[in-house]
């Protein structure tokens, strides 16, 4: 194994990290998925926010992004434009750049980003550094997946939909910026596996036990 590969895929971390010099390491990740919103602009925002979060979870700052997109031939050009605009605006908000990308034809739209960020090699955060006595903090409420599932079944209220959209398009930049000011030992991005799944990965990777106070979890 290359000694400069600080984080690989052996412990299910959010991104890989490669040491370039004594004070610089690259953080790389890729994430894309089918639409979870009917509005293409909103979908672009959600997908970009999700991809950028993997770099934030490693303690890094995203800098360079590549679009990854699949679209049907029948998709209107304006919808494609709005999709890309949604992604671009979130990348711009993060202080990063879109420098290219790749697109293919597919029956179902898909969109996301390949993201490269920077972090100091001594300040990399992983999901396997938790220690006994640490306090587990959530930066967003959980349950967004439940809301999006309800939306697909047309069972979600307007208030619930607005809340889900706000949370899914809020960058974790401010959480990352606050986190790096303190002695945080471990971090992960809670997404598809939910709180329990990602807590299990953190506990297993860190060789510790996690105790969740259910009443304190923001839903």
Language model feature labels by segment:
Residues 1-219:
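Helix-biased detector of long, well-ordered alpha-helical tracts
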């Amino acid at each position: 194994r290359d000694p400069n590969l600080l984080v690989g895929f052996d412990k299910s971390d959010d991104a890989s990290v490669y040491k370039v010099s004594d004070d610089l390491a690259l953080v790389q990740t890729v994430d894309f998925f089918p639409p979870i919103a009917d509005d293409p602009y909103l979908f672009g925002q959600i997908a970009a926010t999700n991809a950028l979060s993997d770099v934030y979870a490693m303690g890094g700052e995203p800098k360079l992004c590549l679009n990854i997109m699949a679209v049907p031939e029948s998709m209107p050009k304006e919808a494609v434009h709005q999709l890309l605009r949604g992604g671009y605006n979130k990348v711009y908000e993060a202080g990063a750049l879109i420098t290219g990308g790749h697109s293919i034809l597919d029956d179902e739209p898909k969109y996301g980003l390949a993201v490269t960020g920077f972090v100091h090699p001594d300040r990399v955060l992983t999901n396997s550094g938790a220690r006994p006595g640490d306090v587990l903090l959530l930066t967003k409420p959980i349950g967004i997946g439940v809301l999006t599932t309800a939306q697909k079944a047309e069972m979600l209220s307007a208030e619930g939909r607005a809340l889900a959209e706000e949370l899914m398009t809020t960058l974790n930049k401010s959480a990352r910026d606050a986190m790096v000011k303190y002695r945080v030992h471990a971090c992960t991005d809670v997404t598809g596996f939910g709180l329990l799944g990602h807590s299990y990965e953190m506990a297993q990777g860190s060789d510790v036990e996690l105790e969740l106070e259910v009443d304190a979890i923001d839903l």
